[in-house]
Amino acid sequence: HEERVCPRILMKCKKDSDCLAECVCLEHGYCG
């Protein structure tokens, strides 16, 4: 399967659009 492009940077978020590239906002409140 195609890997999502997600830089390994710890970023706080409230929604997916707060995150870089193809990262999504995870339940613990950080992008991943």
UniProtKB/Swiss-Prot annotation:
Site positions per UniProt: Reactive bond: R8, I9
Entry's Gene Ontology molecular function annotations: serine-type endopeptidase inhibitor activity
GO cellular component terms, A-Z: extracellular region
Keyword Hydrolase: no
A family per Pfam: Squash
Signal peptide: none
Keywords: Disulfide bond, Knottin, Protease inhibitor, Secreted, Serine protease inhibitor
Keyword check for Disulfide bond: yes
PROSITE patterns: SQUASH_INHIBITOR (PS00286)
Primary localization class, coarse: secreted
Source species, domain of life: Eukaryota
Database matches in InterPro entries: Prot_inh_squash (IPR000737), Proteinase_amylase_inhib_sf (IPR011052)
Domain comment quoted from the record: The presence of a 'disulfide through disulfide knot' structurally defines this protein as a knottin.
Role of this protein: Inhibits trypsin.
Recorded family membership: Belongs to the protease inhibitor I7 (squash-type serine protease inhibitor) family.
Name of the protein: Trypsin inhibitor 4
Organism, as annotated: Cucurbita maxima
